Regions:
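Glycine-rich Rossmann-fold phosphate-binding loop(s) that bind the pyrophosphate
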Residues: 1, 145-146
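Glycine-rich flavin
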Residues: 1-136
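Beta1/beta-strand and adjacent pyrophosphate-binding region of the FAD-binding site
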Residues: 138-143
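N-terminal Rossmann-fold NAD(P) dinucleotide-binding loop
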Residues: 149-150
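Conserved small/polar residues in nucleotide/adenosyl-binding loops
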Residues: 153-155
Length: 155
C-alpha cells in the first residue's frame, strides 16, 4: 500500500537490511578477536534488528514520497481499469477518472506458492512473513531461488 512496491517494502530492501545486520553479527562473533578486540559473546536482539529494518524502509518510502511531491507526480491508490487507451477509472477512497498520454500502472507483486502448500502464516509462510518474524526459527526451508529467498538463507 506504499510506494516502492515489493522491493522497497517486503523484498530487496528489508532482506538486504537484515542481511547487513547478520553480517555485522558474524563479524563480531568471528573476526573481532583476530583484531585484538575482546567482547563478551554477542547475541542477536531480533526486535532491534526488525526495528532497524522498519526504519530503513520508512526512510526509503519517505524519500520516494518526497521525489513524487518534488516532481509534481500525483499518485492514485485503488483498483484501476482502462476506460479507453488514455483514460483510467480508479476505485479507491474516492472514485477518480484520469486521462493522459502516459499512464504508469504499478501493481506490485505477491509471493508465489505451490498448490497444497498455501501459506497459513504460521508454519508455511511467505517471504513477507519471514521478514517480520518475532523469533529466530531453529530450522527453516526456503523454497525458491529468487533474490529474497537467497537472502533469507543467509540471515
Amino acid at each position: 500500500n506504499t510506494l516502492g512496491g515489493t522491493c522497497l517494502n517486503v523484498g530487496c530492501i528489508p532482506s538486504k537490511t537484515l542481511l547487513d545486520s547478520s553480517e555485522h553479527f558474524h563479524t563480531a562473533l568471528h573476526d573481532f578477536e583476530k583484531h585484538g578486540i575482546d567482547i563478551s559473546k554477542p547475541k542477536v536482539n531480533l526486535p532491534n534488528m526488525m526495528a532497524r529494518k522498519d526504519e530503513v524502509i520508512k526512510q526509503t518510502c519517505d524519500g520516494v514520497n518526497f521525489l513524487m511531491d518534488k516532481n509534481n507526480i500525483t499518485v492514485y491508490n485503488g483498483l484501476g481499469s482502462f476506460v479507453d487507451e488514455n483514460t483510467v477509472s480508479i476505485e479507491g477512497d474516492k472514485k477518480s477518472v484520469i486521462s493522459g498520454d502516459n499512464i504508469i500502472i504499478a501493481t506490485g507483486s505477491k509471493p508465489n506458492y505451490f498448490p497444497g502448500m498455501e501459506p497459513d502464516k504460521q508454519r508455511i509462510i511467505t517471504s513477507t512473513e519471514a521478514l517480520s518474524l518475532k523469533e529466530i526459527p531453529k530450522h527453516m526451508i526456503v523454497i525458491g531461488g529468487g533474490v529474497i529467498g537467497l537472502s533469507l538463507i543467509h540471515i
